[in-house]
């Protein structure tokens, strides 16, 4: 295998300092070398356990430390989760992600989590989970159950991280990514723009991700959704061009990764989203909610896809599953419900 050179902070900083249109042009060229620019991967994520999280992530309404009005819910029954997965597949999603507001999963819950993964896989969907910190044995059990992706975000740079989270170290996050990778599960890891970080911190986040032994297969880039009751509720809004620039740099640095528009899409107009796709974003969460924050309605996504000439990507998981793209084009026009908590996984 050819040696992959490591990025330096000065190189990443130079990318962030490029004139925006030059940066977009470079990012789109890189994107076209590795992906069909008209294809966008579509995921649905269900909150299988909501709220009452012991962590203190300052952006998160699911933390038990903040009064956000979020009603906590226990771990869903396996069949409830699988019924939601069936509906997601019928609506055209090709990947079903399951998120739980935990610091880490308890051993008593592992059999139920394994059954969820097995059931989702049996439908011909890709399976993804975000459950917090994992032990080696837990990662291996999920891998044996058939889990395709595990999400565990780094959130920001190592230098700024302590300003946002104190209940879990940066190294713990890196260790979980290593355990997931060693178990044979694909890695999904990204971060959040708008935490109060500097451009240098955004560069530092992408540097950490790109310089992992193997970069994440999926890189969600979130725009902070400010929730009343959280410590970051009064943060300044993120400039759209700054967000687009972050997408473009991520694409250039991780040319074969899927770069996902995640939380914050509800705050973006069509023009901003279009420029994000131009910058190399090629994955979205689809549906009405991102765990506990709004996401554009499904029919709006389809309308935007049509305006831009984009198509939902087909994913061959099991034979006979390629009709999902047609189902998406039909089902996206039906009214949305509040059943899904689709999210930039935390």
From Swiss-Prot:
CC cofactor note: Binds 1 [4Fe-4S] cluster. The cluster is coordinated with 3 cysteines and an exchangeable S-adenosyl-L-methionine.
InterPro entries noted in UniProt: Aldolase_TIM, BATS_dom, Biotin_synth/BioAB, Biotin_synthase, Elp3/MiaA/NifB-like_rSAM, rSAM
GO biological process: biotin biosynthetic process
Gene Ontology terms for molecular function: 2 iron, 2 sulfur cluster binding; 4 iron, 4 sulfur cluster binding; biotin synthase activity; iron ion binding
Role, per record: Catalyzes the conversion of dethiobiotin (DTB) to biotin by the insertion of a sulfur atom into dethiobiotin via a radical-based mechanism.
The family this protein is said to belong to: Belongs to the radical SAM superfamily. Biotin synthase family.
Keywords: 2Fe-2S, 4Fe-4S, Biotin biosynthesis, Iron, Iron-sulfur, Metal-binding, S-adenosyl-L-methionine, Transferase
Pathway: Cofactor biosynthesis; biotin biosynthesis; biotin from 7,8-diaminononanoate: step 2/2
Protein's name according to its UniProt entry: Biotin synthase
Radical SAM core domain segment(s): 38-256
Protein species of origin: Escherichia coli (strain SE11)
Complex and partners: Homodimer.
């Amino acid at each position: 295998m050819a040696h992959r050179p490591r990025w330096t902070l000065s190189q990443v900083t130079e990318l962030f300092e490029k004139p925006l249109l030059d940066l977009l042009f470079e990012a789109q060229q890189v994107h076209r070398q590795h992906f069909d620019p008209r294809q966008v991967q579509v995921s649905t994520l269900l909150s299988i356990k909501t709220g009452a999280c012991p962590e203190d992530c300052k952006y998160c309404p699911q933390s038990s430390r903040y009064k956000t009005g979020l009603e906590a819910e226990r771990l869903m029954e396996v069949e409830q989760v699988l019924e939601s997965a069936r509906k997601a597949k019928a609506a055209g999603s090709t990947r079903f992600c399951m998120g739980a507001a935990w610091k880490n999963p308890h051993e008593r819950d592992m059999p139920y989590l394994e059954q969820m993964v097995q059931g989702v896989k049996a439908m011909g969907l890709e399976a993804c989970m975000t459950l917090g910190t994992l032990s080696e044995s837990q990662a291996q059990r999920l891998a044996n159950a058939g889990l395709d992706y595990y999400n565990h975000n780094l959130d920001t740079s190592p230098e700024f991280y302590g300003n946002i989270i104190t209940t879990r170290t940066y190294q713990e996050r890196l260790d979980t990514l290593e355990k997931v990778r060693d178990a044979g599960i694909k890695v999904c890891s990204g971060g959040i723009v708008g935490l109060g970080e500097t451009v240098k911190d955004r560069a530092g986040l992408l540097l950490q991700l790109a310089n992992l032994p193997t970069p994440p297969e999926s890189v969600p880039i979130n725009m902070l959704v400010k929730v009343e009751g959280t410590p970051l509720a009064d943060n300044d809004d993120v400039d759209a061009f700054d967000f687009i620039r972050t997408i473009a740099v991520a694409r250039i640095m991780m040319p074969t990764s899927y770069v996902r528009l995640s939380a914050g899409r509800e705050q973006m107009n069509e023009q901003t989203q279009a420029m994000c796709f131009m910058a190399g974003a090629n994955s979205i969460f689809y549906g009405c909610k991102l765990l506990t924050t709004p996401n554009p309605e499904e029919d709006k996504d389809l309308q935007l896809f049509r305006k831009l000439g984009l198509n939902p990507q087909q994913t061959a998981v099991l034979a006979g599953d390629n009709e999902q793209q047609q189902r998406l084009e039909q089902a996206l026009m039906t009214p949305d419900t509040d059943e899904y908590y689709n999210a930039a996984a935390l």
